[in-house]
Amino acid sequence: QGAQCTAGPCCWPCKFLKEGTICRRARGDDLDDYCNGISADCPRNPYY
């Protein structure tokens, strides 16, 4: 009850992780990707 999500890099446990939580670490010249607090998906940074 009250679940926001069931799976995803920004979902744990059944709640969206708060905005600013790192969900994908930077690789090479890329930047870290962060949860947005409203989705279970990990949005890509605008510079990928």
From Swiss-Prot:
Record SUPFAM superfamilies: Blood coagulation inhibitor (disintegrin) (SSF57552)
Secreted in keyword set: yes
Intervals of motif Cell attachment site: 27-29
Keyword Disulfide bond: yes
Gene3D superfamilies named in the record: Disintegrin domain
Subcellular location: Secreted
Expression sites by tissue: Expressed by the venom gland.
Family, per entry: Belongs to the venom metalloproteinase (M12B) family. P-II subfamily. P-IIa sub-subfamily.
UniProt-recorded name of the protein: Disintegrin accutin
Origin species: Deinagkistrodon acutus (Hundred-pace snake)
Lineage per the UniProt record: Eukaryota, Metazoa, Chordata, Craniata, Vertebrata
